[in-house]
């Protein structure tokens, strides 16, 4: 049911309806009623199950995490990449695997207006590889080292500390086979913690 539009009472002007005389609005202003838990979601304004708002009271924590991720990634010469939140579903079906739980049960998949199956990204690696190939990064000096952060989506069963929309920081190195890259990625992750 759509939320009803709330109107404020006024002390100016008049109201008029068909066949009725003009009457002055009430002179006394109505004081709003504030519930004991003013921070609780009002009916019709709740977040979807498994989703969470980031509020100003939490800003310092989120900005600190973003800043730390950025500083660490840049210290190891990773360049920032941002990929779309919405991708062609085929990208993840191919990269993650058709029979996997992520593809079969957890992806948010829907048809766009052109009848293309699209999804909210469940992870970022496939999108980064798509961008690498799509933008011809294989022709630039290798390896290509990128980092990202942002929201990912999986239709999991929400639990304490586990949401359907979650934020992920990650680093990818493409075009290098030396295992020293694995050691570097472990070091980056360790320094982030």
Kindly label every feature range from the protein language model.
Residues 2-193:
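TRNA-recognition modules of translation machinery and tRNA-sensing kinases, especially anticodon-binding
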């Amino acid at each position: 049911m759509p939320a009803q539009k709330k109107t404020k009472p006024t002390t100016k002007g008049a109201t008029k309806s068909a066949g009725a005389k003009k009457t002055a609005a009430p002179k006394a202003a109505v004081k709003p009623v504030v519930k004991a838990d003013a921070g609780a979601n009002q009916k019709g304004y709740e977040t979807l199950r498994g989703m969470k708002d980031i509020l100003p009271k939490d800003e310092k924590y989120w900005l600190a995490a973003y800043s730390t991720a950025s500083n660490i990634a840049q210290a190891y010469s990773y360049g920032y990449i941002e990929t779309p939140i919405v991708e062609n579903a085929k990208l993840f079906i191919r990269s993650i695997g058709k029979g996997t739980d992520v593809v079969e049960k957890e992806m948010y998949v829907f048809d766009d207006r052109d009848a293309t199956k699209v999804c909210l990204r469940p992870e970022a690696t496939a999108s980064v590889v798509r961008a690498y190939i799509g933008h011809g990064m294989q022709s630039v000096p290798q390896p290509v080292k990128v980092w990202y952060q942002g929201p990912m989506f999986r239709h999991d069963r929400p639990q304490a500390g586990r949401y359907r929309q979650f934020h992920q920081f990650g680093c990818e190195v493409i075009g290098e086979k030396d295992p020293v890259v694995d050691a570097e990625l472990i070091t980056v992750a360790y320094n982030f913690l």
